[in-house]
């Protein structure tokens, strides 16, 4: 395998994982902020706010795992000579 191709695949995979981690962290933080703000304003609505919060966090984390799959594709599916 050409070292340039291997280096590009590893750098690309690292950028994919870094971008996905940053995006997931920001998304989870925004969702958590909305949950805390909503519970602080209306404590009795806590039960109704948890379900959309966990759905949002689950979707954000699912997007991160899709990034993980693309990273594996780029890193492990590089052409081998």
Curated annotation (Swiss-Prot):
UniProt entry keywords in alphabetical sequence: ATP synthesis, Cell membrane, CF(0), Hydrogen ion transport, Ion transport, Lipid-binding, Membrane, Transmembrane, Transmembrane helix, Transport
Membrane spanning residue stretches: 5-25, 57-77
GO MF assignments: lipid binding; proton-transporting ATP synthase activity, rotational mechanism
PROSITE patterns: ATPASE_C
Membrane-protein topology: Multi-pass membrane protein
Cellular localization per UniProt: Cell membrane
Gene Ontology CC annotation, any one: proton-transporting ATP synthase complex
Site (Reversibly protonated during proton transport): 61
Subunit record text: F-type ATPases have 2 components, F(1) - the catalytic core - and F(0) - the membrane proton channel. F(1) has five subunits: alpha(3), beta(3), gamma(1), delta(1), epsilon(1). F(0) has three main subunits: a(1), b(2) and c(10-14). The alpha and beta chains form an alternating ring which encloses part of the gamma chain. F(1) is attached to F(0) by a central stalk formed by the gamma and epsilon chains, while a peripheral stalk is formed by the delta and b chains.
Family (UniProt): Belongs to the ATPase C chain family.
Protein name in the entry: ATP synthase subunit c
Gene it is expressed from: atpE
């Amino acid at each position: 395998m050409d070292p340039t191709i291997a280096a590009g695949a590893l750098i690309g995979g690292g950028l994919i994982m870094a971008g996905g981690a940053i995006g997931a962290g920001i998304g989870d933080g925004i969702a958590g902020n909305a949950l805390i703000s909503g519970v602080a304003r209306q404590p009795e609505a806590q039960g109704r706010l948890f379900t959309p919060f966990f759905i949002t966090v689950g979707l954000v984390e699912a997007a991160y795992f899709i990034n993980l799959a693309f990273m594996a594709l780029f890193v492990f599916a590089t052409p081998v000579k």
